[in-house]
């Protein structure tokens, strides 16, 4: 009885992802190139494709460690985290956490202290760059709501929004590395952290929250926030209703101007819709 499609797919993955071709070899017809060699070619090609995807997603990490070390690290990552999807733009989300426990990196303590943080930022940046676009929430719809209804709002964030908290100033390191600015890199104080970052791909909104009718019209926005503002924004973007988000912000910092922060987030186009608390 011939194998099912699912069995063929599982055999193929075991070989390509794990190097175990025992189940896949009998399924191949002999040719000028031996079946095991052909599968080896496919496996090497797939691995090279994934390594390249990581290089594109983590350019600053690669520059910090060098191409040779990065490729070795990437291949060690592949051994534990093979791709589960063909959508390579999202591949490597587990890479920052992998770096935190990667033994060869621990031999370089200063680098090990901030490299995973830079990777976490680049992961959020990569997500923002490839997230689907969504029109910003029309503020006129909110203006028409009764005040009591506003408290029940749960905002729907822009798909590109990401929140990153790092122990080191990852944003400063990231900018300095990508700009090849050695002076800026030397001036960085690793004890400056923790830092709280918001990442967003912004379309049609300028830095004052007005419609962007000139320039690129769309760009990556990276903002360092104080912790209270960051926690409030993250709560709103995680689906916490406005009433609860306001209460949480007041409990964390009684002096935090949550209403002002909400107006700023709305003007910056950080939400694309809303629903009401059930």
Language model segments and positions:
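Preference for short coil/turn "hinge" residues that link or interrupt alpha-helices
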Residues: 57-58, 143, 148, 245, ...
């Amino acid at each position: 009885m011939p194998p099912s499609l699912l069995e063929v797919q599982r055999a193929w993955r075991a070989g390509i992802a794990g190097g175990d071709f025992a189940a896949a070899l009998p399924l191949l017809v002999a040719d000028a190139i031996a079946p095991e060699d052909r599968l080896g070619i496919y496996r090497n090609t797939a691995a090279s494709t994934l390594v390249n995807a990581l290089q594109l997603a983590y350019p600053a990490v690669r520059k910090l460690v060098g191409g040779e070390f990065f490729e070795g690290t990437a291949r060690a990552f592949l051994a534990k985290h093979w791709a589960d999807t063909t959508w390579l733009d999202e591949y490597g989300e587990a890479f920052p956490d992998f770096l935190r426990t990667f033994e060869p990196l621990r031999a370089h303590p200063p680098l090990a202290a901030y490299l995973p943080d830079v990777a976490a930022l680049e992961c959020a940046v990569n997500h923002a760059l490839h997230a689907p676009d969504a029109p910003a929430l029309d503020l006129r719809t909110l203006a028409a709501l009764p005040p009591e209804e506003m408290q029940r709002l749960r905002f729907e964030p822009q798909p590109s929004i990401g929140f990153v908290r790092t122990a080191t100033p990852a944003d400063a390191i990231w900018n300095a590395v990508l700009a090849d600015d050695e002076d800026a890199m030397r001036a960085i104080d690793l004890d400056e952290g923790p830092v709280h970052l918001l990442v967003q791909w912004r379309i049609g909104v300028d830095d004052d929250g007005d419609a962007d009718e000139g320039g690129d019209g769309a760009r990556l926005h990276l903002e360092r926030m104080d912790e209270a503002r960051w926690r409030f924004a993250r709560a709103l973007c995680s689906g916490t209703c406005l009433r609860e988000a306001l209460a949480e912000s007041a409990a964390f910092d009684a002096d935090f101007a949550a209403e002002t922060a909400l107006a700023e987030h709305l003007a910056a186009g950080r939400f694309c819709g809303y629903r009401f608390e059930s």
